[in-house]
Regions:
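Structural signature of Gram-negative outer-membrane beta-barrels, strongest in the C-terminal barrel
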Residues: 238-240, 351, 370-374, 378-382, ...
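Outer-membrane beta-barrel translocator/receptor signature
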Residues: 142-145, 156-235, 241-245, 294, ...
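Short acidic/polar hinge/loop motifs at secondary-structure boundaries
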Residues: 102, 111, 127-151, 169-171
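Gram-negative outer-membrane beta-barrel transporters
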Residues: 441, 557-643, 678, 708
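Surface-exposed extracellular loop regions of Gram-negative outer-membrane beta-barrel proteins
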Residues: 257-268, 383-385, 474-519, 524-557, ...
């Protein structure tokens, strides 16, 4: 049961958030009338069907290719599936994606892992963007049409990163006919949300189009005290400058005000589970974590004819956040029940990022066969700065984790904020790729990238100039439905550790080998795949054995190596016109092949060896197929985390979700989602004995009314 007591500031924020909801409530209510009026004048009513449960086409490789034509594992989660499962944030989308492990509150943000490595490559409409940073707010999915996830290394188009995955968020774009989508939802723990999505032509010819999206949310959590109020606005316009040229530009803004939960729960000092209630909140009631994120963007695309196109895209981001918290820190002694004390701090984070990507692509005829070429380049410039303030008076309060009152500690002041200085990161690269038709059933994919990378931080500078990243793949069509493929992909990651000569180590290199089979069944409506993969990451930093550390001063050599390997199976799309399915299974093991401390040990023990995820939905034949039922299963094996001399463990678990929806008429649909039906108690992530161990969500429900015109 959630505690109703809140701080005055928290009550004020919730009242303000509810006030902000009224404009969108009115928009949802008024849109049917506006739609009917416009339909009577010029346009018929249009039903927005979304982008499917698993669209067949992915754009993260610049070329609009089917999943079958990409020689790596790809998952596409479309708008229809996000609506069915009520996936309203990127965290929720990733929790249901094949092979992804989600770990909340890792360095103040949510971390995603694929194949044992942290995902650090993110794109928006194919342009590399800043995410996974303390200043960048969590992503609201109201803006996006679909999410594309390419697993493995992707250094060819993205540059520096880990051999984990690339996540491409594809924005909603204006349509040539009027369309409206409005949603009102209410759920467990006082979660309320309103969305409105309106777009269409802005002149008679349709050569000027626009689309606006707004969303407000006011929510609590399954743990006490914490809440969050968020507001989002997205606007985009498109202009046909000519029959082959389109200019688009837009703005995206998100504001979040939250009472956060930094502490999570601790463990016993021997690593055992204390068994605290899932509603436990071990922070101070005055905690807050706030974000303001603004992104402006523009694209210019031109078709030259005969299949050749050129596109240039630019993004500019400003992201600011501030955090003030106090939370329980310290492992608990089994005998005394003591060990935690209140610790806290105050921080401000400022970020800017400018990014640009430009490319040309098109077909060529060589030796009597048609091939495709892609030539381009991209660049990013990021600045970031962290300010730290000391709480005054400093907190050193014992915490009884079995009977803690979050309101018992008065809010302290904050001393002057200080910063060591600004960190600047620049990366540029040029890339080329060709898809060469060697024979009717055989396509060879070859590519390469040259990257220039440099970073200046307080007291340190680093430059990589240049770094070559190769790529290769082979696709063999067995028949019209099935293909075999193999690929070789590489990526590099700079390191900041210094050798005894005072020079930074060479970059870590990640190499991804993959082979598999893909099928596009039922005329491409159902995609299936089976893949095996082998990843090696070399040149990892190791302490120099010939130069022992003196205090905190250590020297390093590039001697570390890890390996990750496994296989994946996935099926997604339409089994029949009324039955959709999205299922994925991943088996993955990882190991330190060469490490001065952990040699021979598992590399990423916190990622399960086995992950199975399923979502399916079926429109029943009765009642003109107005009633549909759906369900999902998430199964995974156990995982562990090493914390000093002890190991924390979470056993395997299974979660079951259910959904029922009823189409009231051709415009209105009501749905009910029930998640974690059997109320399974589990830890979503384990960090250590002292704090930041996170329960997964208990059983919860969400009721949604959706209007589409």
């Amino acid at each position: 049961m959630r505690k109703e007591s809140k701080t005055g500031a928290g009550q004020a924020r919730r009242k303000a958030a509810r006030a902000l909801q009224w404009p969108l409530w009115l928009a949802v209510a008024a849109a049917p009338v506006q739609a009917q009026e416009q339909a009577a004048q010029s346009l018929p009513a249009v039903t927005v069907s979304g982008d499917g449960i698993a669209p067949d086409t992915a754009t993260l490789g610049k070329l609009p290719l089917s999943v079958r034509e990409i020689p790596q594992s790809v998952t596409v989660i479309g708008l229809e599936r996000m609506q069915e499962q009520n996936l309203q944030s990127l965290d929720e989308v990733m929790q249901h994606a094949t092979g992804i492990t989600v770990q909340p509150y890792q360095l103040l943000t949510t971390a995603y892992y694929s194949r044992g490595f942290k995902v650090d490559s993110f794109e928006q409409d194919g342009v590399p963007v800043l995410m996974g940073n303390m200043a960048a707010s969590p992503r609201d999915m109201a803006v996006y049409e679909r999410v594309e996830i390419l697993r493995g290394a992707n250094g060819l188009l993205h540059g520096a990163g880990n051999p984990a995955a690339t996540v491409n968020l594809v924005r909603k774009r204006p349509q040539r006919e009027f369309a409206f989508n409005g949603t009102v939802s209410a759920g467990s723990w006082e979660r309320y949300r309103v969305e409105a999505d309106l777009g269409g032509p802005l002149n008679a010819s349709g050569s000027v189009r626009g689309r606006i999206v707004g969303a407000v949310e006011d929510r609590g959590y399954f743990y006490d005290v914490a809440d969050q109020q968020s507001a989002l606005f997205y606007g985009i316009g498109e202009v046909d400058l000519g029959p082959r040229t389109v200019l688009s530009a837009g703005l995206q803004y998100q504001r979040i005000r939250s009472t956060t939960n930094m502490a999570g729960v601790p463990r016993y000092s021997d690593g055992g589970d204390i068994g605290l209630p899932r509603s436990t909140y071990l922070d101070a009631a005055w905690d807050r974590f706030n974000w303001d994120t603004t992104r402006v963007f523009a694209d210019l695309e031109h078709g030259f004819g005969e299949g050749w196109t050129a596109k240039i895209s630019a993004n500019y981001l400003t992201a600011d956040s501030n955090l003030k918290y106090a939370g329980a820190y310290g492992a608990i002694d089994r005998e005394t029940g003591l060990g935690s004390r209140l610790m806290g701090g105050a921080y401000k984070f400022d970020n800017t990022q400018a990014s640009v990507d430009a490319y040309v692509s098109g077909p060529v005829q060589w030796f009597g066969r048609r091939h495709e070429l892609l030539l381009g380049g991209n660049a990013q410039r990021t600045t970031s700065e962290q300010y730290t303030g000391m709480l005054t008076p400093a907190l050193n309060v014992p915490v009884n984790v079995f009977d803690w009152d979050p309101h018992s500690v008065p809010e302290p002041g904050v001393g002057p904020y200080t910063s060591p200085g600004e960190t600047r990161l620049k990366q540029q690269g040029i890339y080329a790729m060709g898809r060469f038709s060697l024979a009717d059933p055989v396509t060879l994919v070859l590519g390469g990238r040259m990257s220039w990378w440099n970073q200046s931080a307080p007291g340190a500078r680093q430059r990589i100039d240049p770094e070559f990243t190769p790529y290769g793949g082979l696709i063999v069509d067995l028949d019209k439905d099935w293909s075999l493929y193999g690929s070789y992909a590489q990526v590099f990651q700079p390191q900041s550790q210094l050798t005894r000569d005072g020079k930074p180590l060479d970059p870590v290199t990640g190499t991804n080998y993959e082979a598999g089979v893909k099928g596009a069944l039922a005329d491409g409506a159902l995609n299936v795949s089976l893949a095996v993969f082998h990843i090696q990451q070399k040149n990892r930093a190791q302490q120099d054995p010939d130069w022992p550390c003196v205090g905190n001063n250590c020297y390093y050599v590039s001697g570390g190596e890890v390996r990750s390997r496994g296989f994946e199976a996935e099926a997604s799309g339409q089994v029949t016109p009324y039955w959709t399915v999205a299922a994925g299974y991943t088996f993955n093991t990882s190991k330190y092949l060469s490490d001065s401390v952990s040699n021979g040990q598992p590399f990423a023990s916190f990622t399960p060896k086995h992950i199975f995820r399923l979502w399916t939905n079926y429109a029943l034949p009765a009642m003109e197929r107005r009633l549909s039922v759906g369900g999902g299963v998430q199964m995974q094996s156990g995982y562990s985390t090493v914390s000093g001399p002890v190991t924390l463990r979470q056993g395997g678990y299974t979660l079951v979700d259910l959904r029922m929806a009823y189409r009231l008429d051709k415009h209105l649909t009501a749905s009910l989602n029930l998640n974690n039906v059997f109320d399974r108690r589990y830890y979503q992530s384990l960090s250590g004995t002292s704090w930041n161990n996170r329960y997964g969500e208990p059983r919860n429900v969400m009721l949604t009314l959706r209007a589409q015109y």
